[in-house]
Curated annotation (Swiss-Prot):
Highest taxon above the source species: Eukaryota
Stretches with biased composition (Acidic residues): 382-394
Protein name per UniProt: AT-hook motif nuclear-localized protein 6
Pfam families: PCC
GO terms assigned for molecular function: minor groove of adenine-thymine-rich DNA binding
Cell compartments where the protein resides: Nucleus
Residue segments, region Disordered: 40-112, 365-404
Classification via InterPro entries: AHL, PPC_dom
Residues in PPC domain copies: 157-299
Amino acid sequence: MEEKGEISPSGVVTVKGDEALVPRTEFQQNPSFLQFVSPTTVVTPLPPPPAPSSAPVPTTVTPGSATASTGSDPTKKKRGRPRKYAPDGSLNPRFLRPTLSPTPISSSIPLSGDYQWKRGKAQQQHQPLEFVKKSHKFEYGSPAPTPPLPGLSCYVGANFTTHQFTVNGGEDVTMKVMPYSQQGSRAICILSATGSISNVTLGQPTNAGGTLTYEGRFEILSLSGSFMPTENGGTKGRAGGMSISLAGPNGNIFGGGLAGMLIAAGPVQVVMGSFIVMHQAEQNQKKKPRVMEAFAPPQPQAPPQLQQQQPPTFTITTVNSTSPSVNTVEEQKPQAYGGGIVRPMAQMPSSFQNDNSTMNNFTPAYHGYGNMNTGTTHKEEHEDEDGGDDDDDSGDTRSQSHSG
């Protein structure tokens, strides 16, 4: 069925066919809006979404028109990025990620023993004690020494150091080892030796204490020994020795404790170690207890402002209830050049320097720097002068009387 739409001169759009059922739109109510629309184009806006109903809604498309009629075509291709969520709020199937169903561990990897991949709190509570891992704590400093086992004098091996040296042919192996044992207070032990020997002196394991000397070329099978430091009554020494096993040219094996020289027939390589005996290490670690001197806590002092505000205190001893106390500096001493006595010098307290009433009653002592009877001498001189004048006057009177 062919459908056409026409525009009348009055601006009313005429729709034929099924479009007559569609209600009038804004374009029909406002004819002036259609002046911008091409006369050959019919624009039909989408109506509001109809109420859901069981009957399907027919959709028609007008050929030659730019927009479809009511309803949406799900097969129509749209431009732009597709929406992640559908209008109903569900996730777009394109954005769904395939979920993998993991295979249970029990079916993929068989467990053996008490080992498990996951360790939850509930599982840790039921685990035996031997499977619980404990955190390791690193303690700085030397650990506390443990007492030796019964039958052992002390533990050895503290600060163990290895040494290696080579003895040339014609040299004594024993003389090369002894200097190491004499250095410091370290103990040494011979671990191994390889080479050949030309001369060796061994001790006899008898009560006579004889020695046997072997000359030739012998291979060293083993060389061992130790030298431990000892101290007896303040005298330090060494205790120990070495033993050796040798093989002769015909395959004979002999050996024993060294009782003399051990001359090398060729290069002999010796490996030994030095260490500190445990009881010596303990003695070195013991330190004198630190003596802390006890000091009396300082007494709190008043601030300088309070010290200035406190009134000064004085101790006054009255003499004759009127004069203040006099502090003598030194006792009476005769003057070095004669002529009197040096009287003690009086010092007046500072509190009485501005007291007029006290000063009136206080008679300072004079410092004697000569004859203390100077006042009397001056009086006698004045009296002599006055007497001389009297004599002169009397002489004049007599002369006048004689002249008269």
